[in-house]
């Protein structure tokens, strides 16, 4: 494990600002706050609120390589567009070496759609990502999202715990999973992940900042390692986005 690249104080707490949604969700995600269509907005939030890293796809990381270079980048290695339906598969688009050496990534991430009929390909691709990242000394973050016709509720406690365990079994340093609905059930997900750190997948915009912050509090009480939040920050106007960012980071690092 190479968490020292992103673990600033040695406590294993992480607040990632996710901005990889533009590929899969399209520009509609930016409509609530058009300023967020520019990665400059997100980089400024990350800088001002001291997020652990900002999450970019390859192209955004390349386009902004010289913009606020002091903000650490976590490069998302795979992705897909959101127009085609059916069983999801998110192919590897960016090699680990390119992310680290050309894009200056301090960590790399990969999505696995657990339960998809294409699951085996994604498991194999991520296993290789872990080996490549290990060779270069950078941590890996596994987005583990149960999805597909074989999956019922993707937030059922046993499904979330399974997702966390898969990340551990494959060698991920950090697992990004959905909220399972309660502190006790999320605690079991964290226990199931053993030494892999578990962070919350932020999800869709909540009606109020307080609603999302209550979930963050639950994650931390359950033994979670933090959050990877996107829409619940940058879909809000700048002042509100900055305020909730500071609240998120403070809770994670408390």
Segments the model singles out, each with a brief description of its role:
Residues 220-222, 234-254:
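C-terminal helical cap(s) of enzyme catalytic domains, especially alpha/beta-barrels
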Residues 179, 202, 231:
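Active-site proximal loops enriched in glycine and acidic residues that flank catalytic Cys/His/Asp
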Residues 227-234:
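Short acidic/histidine-rich active-site segments
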Residues 6-9, 26, 148, 236-237:
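Surface-exposed loop/turn and secondary-structure junction residues enriched for glycine/proline
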Residues 1-11, 15:
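N-terminal basic/disordered segments at the start of proteins
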């Amino acid at each position: 494990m190479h968490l020292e690249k992103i673990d600033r104080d040695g406590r294993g707490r992480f607040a990632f600002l996710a901005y990889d949604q533009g590929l899969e969700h399209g520009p509609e995600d930016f409509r609530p706050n058009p300023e967020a269509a520019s990665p400059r907005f997100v980089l400024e939030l990350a800088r001002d609120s001291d997020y652990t890293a900002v999450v970019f796809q390859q192209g955004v990381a390349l386009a902004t390589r010289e913009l606020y270079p002091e903000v650490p980048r976590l490069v998302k290695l795979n992705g897909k567009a959101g127009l085609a339906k059916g069983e999801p598969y998110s192919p590897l688009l960016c090699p680990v070496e390119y992310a680290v050496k050309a894009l200056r990534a301090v960590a790399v991430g990969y999505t696995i759609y657990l339960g998809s009929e294409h699951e085996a390909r994604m498991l194999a691709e991520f296993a290789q990502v872990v080996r490549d990242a290990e060779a270069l000394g950078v941590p890996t973050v596994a987005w583990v999202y149960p999805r597909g016709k074989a999956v019922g509720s993707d937030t059922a406690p046993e499904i979330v715990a399974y997702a966390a365990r898969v990340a551990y079994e494959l060698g991920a340093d950090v697992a990004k999973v959905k909220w399972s609905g309660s502190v006790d059930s999320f605690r079991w997900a964290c226990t199931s992940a053993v030494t892999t750190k578990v962070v919350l997948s932020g999800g869709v915009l909540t009606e109020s900042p307080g609603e999302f912050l209550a979930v963050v509090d639950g994650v931390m009480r359950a033994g979670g390692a933090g959050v990877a939040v996107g829409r619940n920050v940058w879909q809000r106007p700048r002042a509100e986005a900055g305020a909730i960012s500071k609240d998120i980071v403070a809770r994670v690092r408390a």
